[in-house]
Amino acid sequence: AHEPVLPPSRWGEMQINSMFERYYSVSDAFQEADAVARVKVGDWQGEDLRNWVTFFDASVQESYKGELPRSFTLVQGGCSEATSPGYPLFTSGTELLVFLRDYDGSGEKYHPITDYNTVLYVVYDEAGGRYFLDSFGTMSAQDTCVPGRTTLDSAQLAEMTADTDPVLAEAISSQAKDCDGCSIYAESALEDYFSDLAKQ
């Protein structure tokens, strides 16, 4: 095992406020994505400062849709020059549920649809139960009927992000204050929902 390669900084020197043509519900994102998977972020590969994106190694832990390679390049919006508020650059060990599109047609690089709007962070309860956290609230705002969904208050949120890296935990916490809590989805319920969507 080698020392993980980390991004030079988790935050850019500037903040970018992105405007999106649309927001996605879980079901819309699932249908539109080339691939949907729970992934673990590995080494930082580098950044493209012209397009303000950063590249990371990522490994698929669980695939729900599409034919992702076991290891692929995850492309995140943001770089050392600019990041979106509340959305630090990933780091080695970050676990995510992502709704992905092929970035450049190579089948090796993928980016989340509309970037952070379709990125859910993986968090765990005390018993080791796995949940997916919508820290920006944009997916859950479109999706009031998805099973297994709960809204956490700040104390519950602090508990469930205690093992998350401190930069991300702090970003999630400040985001939750802006949105009056964060929604989480239970893994088992979302997996059942995905298998129903896949049959449609």
Model-derived features: positions:
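Short, surface-exposed secondary-structure edge patches
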Residues: 26, 33, 83-89
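Solvent-exposed loop/turn segments at secondary-structure junctions
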Residues: 44-48, 63-66, 79-82, 103-107, ...
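Short, solvent-exposed beta-strand/turn "edge" segments of beta-rich domains on protein surfaces
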Residues: 26-35, 46-50
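Netrin-like (NTR/C345C) domain of secreted extracellular proteins
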Residues: 1-7, 84-200
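OB-fold (S1/OB) nucleic-acid-binding surfaces
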Residues: 50-78
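Short boundary/loop segments of OB/S1/cold-shock single-stranded nucleic-acid-binding domains
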Residues: 13-32
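Conserved positions in beta-strands of structured domains
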Residues: 40-42
